[in-house]
């Protein structure tokens, strides 16, 4: 089965770092809901500011919060712009729909739903 993008939060800004936390990425519940992530879901993080890419999981936080925890805290700084993406194995790619949430300053600007048919 192909692995396709399921959910993406684009344009998030890191608001904090916690090196001595056990690990993960804290996202505000508002961000989790808008993008369609699940708590404890495995995600890929792409740091637009410095080019770092890493895998972690989501934990819910306060509205607007984007905190790099544990080892991930070494891969970004407060103020860095990041993209967070979740993928899934898809049995029927033709009917797959992904959610793309666009943020500015950690405030939701737009939500798009895209399908493979939108790509052709």
UniProtKB/Swiss-Prot annotation:
The EC number(s) this enzyme carries: 4.1.1.11
Function: Catalyzes the pyruvoyl-dependent decarboxylation of aspartate to produce beta-alanine.
Keywords: Autocatalytic cleavage, Cytoplasm, Decarboxylase, Lyase, Pantothenate biosynthesis, Pyruvate, Schiff base, Zymogen
Major localization listed first in the record, in broad terms: cytoplasm
Localization per Swiss-Prot or TrEMBL: Cytoplasm
UniProt record, GO biological process: alanine biosynthetic process; pantothenate biosynthetic process
Active-site residues, Swiss-Prot/TrEMBL: 24 (schiff-base intermediate with substrate), 57 (proton donor)
Binding site for substrate: 56, 70-72
PTM comment, free text: Is synthesized initially as an inactive proenzyme, which is activated by self-cleavage at a specific serine bond to produce a beta-subunit with a hydroxyl group at its C-terminus and an alpha-subunit with a pyruvoyl group at its N-terminus.
Cofactor annotation remark: Binds 1 pyruvoyl group covalently per subunit.
Subunit structure as annotated in this protein's UniProt entry: Heterooctamer of four alpha and four beta subunits.
InterPro entries linked: Asp_de-COase-like_dom_sf, Asp_decarbox
Domain of life of the native organism: Archaea
UniProt name for this protein: Aspartate 1-decarboxylase
Record field: catalytic activity: L-aspartate + H(+) = beta-alanine + CO2
Any Gene Ontology CC annotation: cytosol
List of residues that carry Pyruvic acid (Ser): 24
Leader peptide range in chain numbering: none
Pathway the protein contributes to: Cofactor biosynthesis; (R)-pantothenate biosynthesis; beta-alanine from L-aspartate: step 1/1
Cofactor: pyruvate
Source species: Pyrobaculum islandicum (strain DSM 4184 / JCM 9189 / GEO3)
Single annotated GO MF: aspartate 1-decarboxylase activity
């Amino acid at each position: 089965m192909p692995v396709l993008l399921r959910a993406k939060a684009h344009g998030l800004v890191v608001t904090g770092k916690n090196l001595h936390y056990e690990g993960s990425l804290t996202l505000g519940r508002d961000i989790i809901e808008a993008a369609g992530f699940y708590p404890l879901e495995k995600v890929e993080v792409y740091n637009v500011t410095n080019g770092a890419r890493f895998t972690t999981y989501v934990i819910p936080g306060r509205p607007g919060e984007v905190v790099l925890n544990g080892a991930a805290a070494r891969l970004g700084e407060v103020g860095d712009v990041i993209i967070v993406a979740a993928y899934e194995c898809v049995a029927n790619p033709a009917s797959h729909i992904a959610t793309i949430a666009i943020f500015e300053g950690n405030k939701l600007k737009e939500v798009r739903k895209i399908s493979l048919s939108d790509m052709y």
